[in-house]
C-alpha cells in the first residue's frame, strides 16, 4: 500500500517478525508471544485483546473506536519496544538481508505472464476431466483413500500399505512416490488410465498454484516475490502468502511465466553442489575437496567406484546413483533409506538390499572423515549442555548454551536440549524433536551454505547493473539491462565463485545463464 498505492518508498525496512524468527527460529514470531518471551517480567508489555470486540462490527461506536485506537497504539509501541531489544546485537548483514527480502515483495520488478498461466490452468482442468472420463471412475472415488482402496479390491488388486508415521498402524500406500504404490502400478499396466486419473485428481497443485500466481499479480503486471526470511532454523528461506517459489519444477509453465520487462533480462546463477562442498570442507575430506577444486565430476568418480568401471556423464543412470550417494549419504543415511530414495527418484533405480548396503559402506570408507565429523557433532551436542564447554570452537562454530554460534553472528538453536534415555531431544513451539550427530551435521552444513549464498545475494545486489529479484535454494535470480549481458553475468559468477573469509579455502563453483523468462 505504502509503495505501490501512495508511492512512498522507505529508505530501509526493518521487520520485527523476521528478526524474531532469526533470533528464536524454533519459536512463535507472533507479537503476542514475542513480548512475553522478550519481557517476561514486565506485565505492562502484553498485547491487548480489544480487537475481538470489533469482530463483525462495521461502524464503531465512540467507546469501541477509542478501544481499537488504543489497541493499535499499543501494537505500535510493543513492536517498537521489541525492535529496540532485537536490534542491539543483530548482525548488520542479516538486517540488510531482511531489507532486501522485504523489497522483493513490496517493490516488485518481475512481471507475470497472466495470459500464459490462464491458458495453462484451463488446460490442466481439461486434462483432469479427460483423464477421469477415460478411467471410467468417478472423481469422488479417485480422490478418497477409502473409496479408492475398495475400488482396487473390487478389481482383485491387493491394496499396497505402509506404516503410518503417526499411529504406527498400516495404512494404504497411495502416495505417488510410495515404493509399494509404484510397484502396484507397474504390476498392472492394463489399468494405466486409472493410475493416471488418480494422480491427476490428487495432484491439483499445479492448477491451484497457477490460480494463486494469477491472483497475486498486481494490476500493472508486476509480481511481488513472497519470501519468508528464516523459514527454517538453519536460516533457509521458505514460501509465504500460500506461494512457494522454492519448488518450481525446472521447465514448468509456472516458472516460465515469470519474465523480465522489455529491454531487461533475468540473470540466473546457481551454486554448484554447495552442501557437498561445505561438508567436505568442514570434515577436512581432502580427496573430495581436491576433486571439487580441480573441477572433476565427483558424481561420476563415486559411481565409478560403485560399478567398478569408468562412469561418464553419458552413463546417465549410473551417474544419478553416484549423485544420489554424494548428496544423500553425507548425513548418515542408512542403506534402506538410500534404497528407497533411489527407487522413488527420477529416474527410478531399483537396487537390492545388499547393493544399497555396499554403496553406503563404500561411501563411508572412501570419505572416512565425514563419519568422523558426525562423531564430532555428537560431541558438540554434549558441549552445548556443558557450561565448561561454552566458548569452545570447532571450525567457524562456537559453542553456546544449547546453541552453536555461526560465523555471521546468528546461531543454530536447540531449546531445552537434553540427553534422555540414550537420545538427544530439544523443543520447538510445536513439538519435541530428536536429533543426533549426523542430523546436527546436516543442520550445520545447511546453515553455513545458507550464509554463503545470502552474502552473495547482498554482494550481487550491490552491483549497479542489476537488482536481485528472487532466491531459490542455491540459485540467485537478478534482473538488469540486456546491454552487455555477458559482462554482467561474468561479474555475478565471479561473486559466486569467491568464498567468504571464514572459509577462504572452500572451492566454490557456479554456472548461470541469461533469459527474458525464468526458464533456466
For each of these PLM feature ranges, what is it?
Residues 3-13, 27-32, 285-289:
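A short alpha->loop->secondary-structure connector
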Residues 15-16, 135, 143-147, 320-322, ...:
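Short Gly/Ser/Thr- and Asp/Glu-enriched loop/turn motifs at secondary-structure junctions
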Residues 158, 224, 232, 307-464, ...:
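Conserved catalytic core of nucleic-acid polymerases
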Residues 226-311:
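Function-dense linear segments that define catalytic or interfacial modules
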Residues 460-511:
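C-terminal structured "cap/appendage" subdomains that terminate the fold
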Amino acid at each position: 500500500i505504502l509503495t505501490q498505492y501512495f508511492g512512498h518508498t522507505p529508505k530501509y525496512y526493518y521487520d520485527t517478525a523476521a528478526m524474531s524468527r532469526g533470533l528464536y527460529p524454533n519459536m512463535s514470531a507472533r507479537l503476542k508471544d514475542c513480548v512475553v518471551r522478550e519481557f517476561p517480567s514486565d506485565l505492562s508489555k502484553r498485547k491487548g485483546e480489544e480487537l475481538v470486540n470489533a469482530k463483525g462490527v462495521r461502524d464503531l461506536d465512540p467507546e469501541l473506536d477509542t478501544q481499537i485506537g488504543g489497541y493499535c497504539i499499543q501494537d505500535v509501541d510493543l513492536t517498537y519496544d521489541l525492535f529496540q531489544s532485537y536490534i542491539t546485537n543483530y548482525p548488520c548483514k542479516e538486517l540488510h538481508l531482511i531489507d532486501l527480502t522485504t523489497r522483493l515483495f513490496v517493490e516488485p520488478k518481475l512481471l507475470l505472464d497472466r495470459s500464459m498461466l490462464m491458458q495453462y490452468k484451463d488446460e490442466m482442468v481439461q486434462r483432469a476431466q479427460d483423464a477421469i472420463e477415460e478411467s471410467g471412475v468417478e472423481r469422488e472415488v479417485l480422490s478418497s483413500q477409502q473409496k479408492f482402496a475398495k475400488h482396487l479390491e473390487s478389481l482383485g488388486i491387493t491394496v499396497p500399505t505402509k506404516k503410518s508415521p503417526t499411529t504406527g498402524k498400516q495404512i494404504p500406500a497411495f502416495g505417488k512416490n510410495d515404493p509399494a504404490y509404484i510397484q502396484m502400478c507397474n504390476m498392472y499396466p492394463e489399468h494405466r488410465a486409472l493410475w493416471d486419473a488418480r494422480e491427476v485428481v490428487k495432484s491439483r497443485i499445479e492448477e491451484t498454484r497457477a490460480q494463486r500466481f494469477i491472483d497475486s499479480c498486481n494490476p500493472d503486471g508486476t509480481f511481488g516475490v513472497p519470501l519468508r526470511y528464516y523459514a527454517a532454523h538453519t536460516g533457509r528461506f521458505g514460501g509465504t502468502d500460500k506461494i512457494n517459489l522454492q519448488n518450481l519444477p525446472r521447465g514448468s509453465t509456472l516458472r516460465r511465466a515469470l519474465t523480465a520487462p522489455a529491454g531487461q533480462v533475468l540473470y540466473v546463477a546457481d551454486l554448484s553442489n554447495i552442501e557437498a562442498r561445505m561438508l567436505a570442507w568442514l570434515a577436512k575430506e581432502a580427496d573430495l575437496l581436491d576433486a571439487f577444486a580441480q573441477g572433476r565430476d565427483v558424481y561420476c568418480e563415486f559411481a565409478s567406484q560403485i560399478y567398478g568401471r569408468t562412469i561418464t556423464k553419458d552413463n546417465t543412470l549410473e551417474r544419478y546413483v553416484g549423485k544420489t550417494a554424494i548428496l544423500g549419504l553425507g548425513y548418515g543415511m542408512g542403506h534402506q533409506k538410500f534404497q528407497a530414495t533411489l527407487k522413488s527418484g527420477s529416474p527410478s533405480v531399483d537396487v537390492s538390499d545388499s547393493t544399497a548396503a555396499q554403496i553406503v559402506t563404500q561411501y563411508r570408507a572412501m570419505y572416512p572423515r565425514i563419519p568422523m565429523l558426525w562423531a564430532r557433532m555428537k560431541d558438540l551436542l554434549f558441549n552445548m549442555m556443558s557450561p565448561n564447554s561454552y566458548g569452545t570452537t570447532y571450525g567457524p562454530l562456537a559453542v553456546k548454551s544449547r546453541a552453536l554460534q555461526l560465523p555471521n553472528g546468528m546461531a543454530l538453536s536447540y531449546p531445552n536440549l537434553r540427553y534422555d534415555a540414550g537420545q538427544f531431544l530439544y523443543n520447538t513451539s510445536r513439538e519435541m524433536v530428536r536429533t543426533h550427530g549426523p542430523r546436527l551435521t546436516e543442520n550445520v552444513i545447511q546453515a553455513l551454505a545458507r550464509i554463503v549464498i545470502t552474502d552473495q545475494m547482498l554482494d550481487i545486489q550491490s552491483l549497479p547493473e542489476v537488482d536481485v529479484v528472487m532466491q531459490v535454494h542455491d540459485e540467485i535470480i537478478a534482473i538488469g539491462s540486456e546491454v552487455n549481458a555477458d559482462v554482467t553475468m561474468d561479474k555475478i559468477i565471479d561473486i559466486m565463485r569467491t568464498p567468504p573469509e571464514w572459509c577462504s579455502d572452500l572451492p566454490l563453483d557456479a554456472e548461470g545463464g541469461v533469459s527474458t523468462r525464468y526458464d533456466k
